[in-house]
Each structure stands twice: as structure tokens, then as C-alpha cells.
Amino acid sequence: MDKKQAVAEIIRLREEIDRHNYRYYVLARPEISDFQYDAMLEKLVALEGEFPELKTSDSPSQRVGGGITKEFPTVEHREPMLSLSNTYSIEEVGEFYHRVVKLLPEEHRDSPEFVAELKFDGVAVSLLYRDGLLVRGATRGDGSQGDDITGNIRTIRSVPLRLGNPSGSGEGVERYEGREIEVRGEVFMTKTDFAVLNEGRPEEERFANPRNATAGTLKLQDSGEVSRRKMVFVAYYLKESSAEIISHAERLELLERLGFYTGGEHRVCRTLKDIREYIDGWQKKRLTGLPYEIDGIVLKLNNTALRDELGATSKSPRWAIAYKFPAERARTVIRSIVFQVGRLGTITPVAELEPVRLAGTTVSRSTLHNLEEVERLDVRLHDTVVIEKSGEIIPKVISVVEEKRRPGTLPVVVPESCPSCGTPLVKPPNEVHYYCPNSEGCPAQTKARIEHFASRNAMDINGLGKAIVEQLVSSGMVVDAGDLYRLTPDLIMRLDRQAEKSAGNLVNAIAKSRNREYFRVLFALGIRHVGIATARELAGAYPTLDMLCKASVEALSDVTDVGPVIAESVHAFFRKPSATAMIEKLREAGVRLEAEKTKKPVNLNFDGMKVIFTGALERYTRDEAAGLVRERGGKTVASVSKNTNLVVYGKEPGSKLEKARKLGVRVITESEFEEMLGEVGSNE
């Protein structure tokens, strides 16, 4: 076969393979057997091997994998991948519905539309396409940053490597030339494919459930092995700035035209009754058996322009909620009750259980939350209890089976002193928790603070696990997190099971953490009430730790998502001698204690403004223009209302311009918009 014939055959095979992928994953109407599909793919791989210059990044042959990835770089998400608020109560679904409707502009309250869709139990990922070609796949991570797993994502057959419906009846890639778009969704494994995967593994290496199998597979270094494990990508979000597409349902339809599988079961609901019927229907279908795992229903406001109006909190959008199906329950027996001490001194009772299967995993521990809960449930040693798993990592005890209680058992004795250091416990007024007040001298608190400091969302020190932290603190080598940076391989080798190589690796991991982002350092400090989102807001308001240390309670209270309680906590933390000493050690070690200097606009001319673009702009794409507004403190919305501050119009503007003028909204040309942008300078 000469090169001209090879080109024609490669094109034919690619088109056929893409078409069969689409029929199998999107339409669920396969035309050929797996054997026939594999034969075509093998022929394509062989031809591209013979003519390597004809191989392209969007060829189906790229799904075969085979490359080895030594690490997965961290990447920033264009927009945060927020988690959804969730509920297990159908009544709370109704409250969500009425709350959202009440927030809508008056003209939309009589006819609200919500989209109900299945909540697949998988792993959230983000796909980035440039000029219609897949260029990046990333995990959700902490919502702001994730891991680049592009090589593994390429192996998933339901992920289009090139946008466009292979059947020839959809959107062409031309629509996205010169543009970047983002598609988000869930990767999951069907029950059948999960069973096949586990069948080929030793008993001790089998995965507990399809979700765990999916999460583990996506982080494998060998993409060839990933390609052999069948996974499915279901798309649920498209970042699309087109003025013609104003509803979530339309975006789902566009995703299908672009070659994505969307689940095909979404429904536009116009009343609360519609929503309840959808939920009830899928609860029944779930009990009769589905080919995949779903753990709930997601409800989203359909109108994307109204979504922009409602916005989001630091954790979740206001216009969506996840209804989780009723939690699974199981019976087991309490072996013992232990009292754990957290990094802030909180005493938490935990039940050690007879191992039992629950929600696809083996459970041997269950939280009892607090000592008041122990008294309320009247939990006793050797009781038979009902445990429930409702999305928590550790299940909870919800009731005692009293008819199975042994005669003569006694109530749990509430400890009077800390199980770690022996300090008398205290219980602040109006709180349910008991605390150990010995924050400086309690070994359990010190260990928990070090573990928090090293955790992935904080300093991400690989290899610094619970067992090593236990030895470091018990030996006196580490008193606070700052001491970690003074460790040497020789010191670490004095610990149990620490050879020269592992000691060197740990020292290198600690050294690497010096360059973690400033907001993660703030989170790692373990300040009461300061989570990762609040740490990010504090870092934005106070770009150096010195500035933050000097801030007053009043000034801190003005920071987004920081109220008086958090402000008091932050202010008090930086006035503790132990915190000051630790920070000095971190400073000496070269840990980043200020935000990275970046270029900033010299003005905030769009600060707090809601801006709309209409018509074709000459100098910018719509996404570029929107980004410039965001950088200068504003936000873009999709529809004109009395709350809109500015409309920028280009060639052939639509009805938005006319509506803006009727409402008295300020309108400007692209040239005037460019003047408003001003110059961009440096903060150095």
C-alpha cells in the first residue's frame, strides 16, 4: 500500500471507528461486535505505525494508550469546580425550589424551569478543547486545582478527541476554531465492566465498588492498562458563550451533537410535582437494577442567564442541588468505644465495630459525633446498632437495637480528662463538644496538627503519614510544623522502618512543599474555622502573612466569607506565642508566606459591575472580553435586566441592545469598552 492509499484508508477507518463509538456510547445502538471493532482499531494502529507521519492527536488509535506517566502535574481550573449542596430530604428539595423561585426576577417566577438529571456515582473531570481538539483532561481536585490526566482521559472511548457528531448530523468542529471550550462530567464504570475487572484480580486486591475502581484507574501511570479497563464519560456541563443557547437543556442537546454521551435521561420540570415524579420514578428504577450506579438526582435551574444572576457561595451554586437517595443501613455490634482528640482539642467518640458490608465497602468504625449523642442514643459496649452511610467517609450510628442488648451492660462513662495528656476536659457554654484545653502540650493535638499540615489540600507532603508523625512527635524531633523543615535523612533513619532511600524521599517531599501556594500555607496552619475557601479569600485580601498578622478583627470581618467569629479566631491565632514561633521557623525554612506577584490591571473600572456583550466584537473573542471584565472586578451575565450595569455592543447587535436602552442601562461601543479597560501594569 502506497502513502496515498494509506491516507484514504486511515481516514476511512477513523471515521468508521468514531461513528461506531458514537452509536455505542451516545445512541446505545451498536451495529458491530466488539471483535469487529477491535479488528478495525488494530488495522488503524498498524497503518499509523507503518506511516507515523500520518498519526494525529485526534486519531482513535490514541485511545490504545501505552505511555507511562511518572507524575500528574497540578493544573488550575478556568472556573472553580464547585460541589453541589445536597440533601436526603424530599422536603428540603421543595424548600430549595421555593427559595430559588423567590430569588428570580418577578417576570420569571410564574414559569420557572428546572432540569432534573441523574447523579452518576463516579469521578468528576474537566475536559478542555482548543480548536475543537482535546488538549487537556483534569481531575476535580480541590475544586480550584486538579491533576492533569490527559493521557488516561484519551483512552476513554466515549470522550471525543475531536468535537463533532461522527454521524454527520451534528455540529462541526468549525464552530470552535480559534476558541477554547470546557466540558465537565463524570467518569464511571458500569456494573458489568466493574465485575469483569474484579474477576481478574486476587481477592485481596479487588476494588470495593465501581467508584473506587474508577478513581484508582484514572491515576494509573500506565495508560495502556487504563485503556484495558472500560470506563464511560457522561457530560453534564458545557462552557458555551453563544447568545443563542440560553438554557441548560439546550446545552445538553448541543453536547450530544458534539459527540458526547449525556445519560439521555434528563427532564425539564416546570413544577415541584414534576420534580417529585422524576425523583420517585428513578428511585423505583434504581431498586429494580440499573447497569450503572446512581446515587441521586441533580436539579439545576434551566435558564443559564438567571443562574448568573443567582451566583454561588464559596462552596456551591445557589441554583442547583443534589438530592441523594436514602442512605444504606446495616446492623453490626460495637466492640469498643474510643475517644479521639482532634487538632483543635475536640473530643470525638468513635465506635469500633464488627466488620460489616455497607454501600460497597467494609465498615469497621463509626462516628458517634459527640458525647451528648452517646448519651442520647444510650450506646453501650457490645450493643447491636444500626449504622448508616449518607456520603460520609465514616458512617454514623443512628440507633440501638435494644431487644438485643446483653443483660447488665452499663452506659458509657464520659471521660473527665483528655485520653492523650490527662488534662481535665472543658465544655464551653452552648456547645455539644468537650475539649482538651492543653493545645500546646497535648501530644494527640500536636500529631493531628502535623497530619493536617501535611495533607493534600495543605502542604501535600507525600510520605508523611500517621505512623511517621506518631514517631516524630513521640521522639521529640517535631514540636510543631516548622520543625519538619529541620529534619535530615539521618534523623529520620532513627525511626522504625525508615531506610536511607525512604528517609531521603521524605526530606525531598518536605523541601518541595516550601513552594506551595500562599493560601495553602494559611490553610495548613490549622486556624479554627478557616477552611480552604476562606484561606483563599484571606490570601486575596492580605497578600503577605505579615499583613494578615497585623489585621484587626474589624478589618478581617470585611473579607468575603469571613464574619466576626472567623475574624476573632484568625486574630487570636496570630497572637499566640506558639504560632509566632512556628511561623518564624517556616520563614527561616523559606516557606512561601506571600502571594505570588502577578500582573494586575491598574484600574478596577468594572468592579462590581454586571456586563453583557451583544453582537460580533472585532478585537476580542467573547471569552477574551469576559475574562478582561473579570480581571477588573466585574462579571458577565447573559440577559439584560434592571440589575445590569453595562451593555457592550459590536456588529449586528441583537435584541439585548434595544432592551437595555428601554431599561435605561448604559450602552457603549467596543472602542469605548477598550478605553475602559485601561492599561495593564505590574504590582512589583
From Swiss-Prot:
Residue sites binding Zn(2+) per the record: C418, C421, C436, C442
Any idea of its EC number?
Answer: 6.5.1.2
Q: Which UniProt keywords apply?
A: DNA damage, DNA repair, DNA replication, Ligase, Magnesium, Manganese, Metal-binding, NAD, Zinc
* PROSITE patterns given in the database record: BRCT, DNA_LIGASE_N1
What is the protein named? DNA ligase
Matching entries from SMART domains are given as: BRCT, HhH1, LIGANc
Entries under Pfam families matching the protein? BRCT (PF00533), DNA_ligase_aden (PF01653), DNA_ligase_OB (PF03120), DNA_ligase_ZBD (PF03119), HHH_2 (PF12826)
Q: What does this protein do?
A: DNA ligase that catalyzes the formation of phosphodiester linkages between 5'-phosphoryl and 3'-hydroxyl groups in double-stranded DNA using NAD as a coenzyme and as the energy source for the reaction. It is essential for DNA replication and repair of damaged DNA.
> What Gene Ontology molecular function terms does this protein carry?
DNA binding; DNA ligase (NAD+) activity; metal ion binding
> Record keywords: Transmembrane included?
no
Positions of the catalytic residues: K119
Task: State the source organism's domain of life.
Answer: Bacteria
Q: Which family is this sequence assigned to?
A: Belongs to the NAD-dependent DNA ligase family. LigA subfamily.
Q: Per the record, what are the reactions this protein catalyses?
A: NAD(+) + (deoxyribonucleotide)n-3'-hydroxyl + 5'-phospho-(deoxyribonucleotide)m = (deoxyribonucleotide)n+m + AMP + beta-nicotinamide D-nucleotide
Q: Where does this protein hold NAD(+)?
A: D34, F35, Q36, Y37, D38, S83, L84, E117, R140, E186, K300, K324
Q: BRCT domain: which residues?
A: 601-684
Answer yes or no on keyword Hydrolase: no
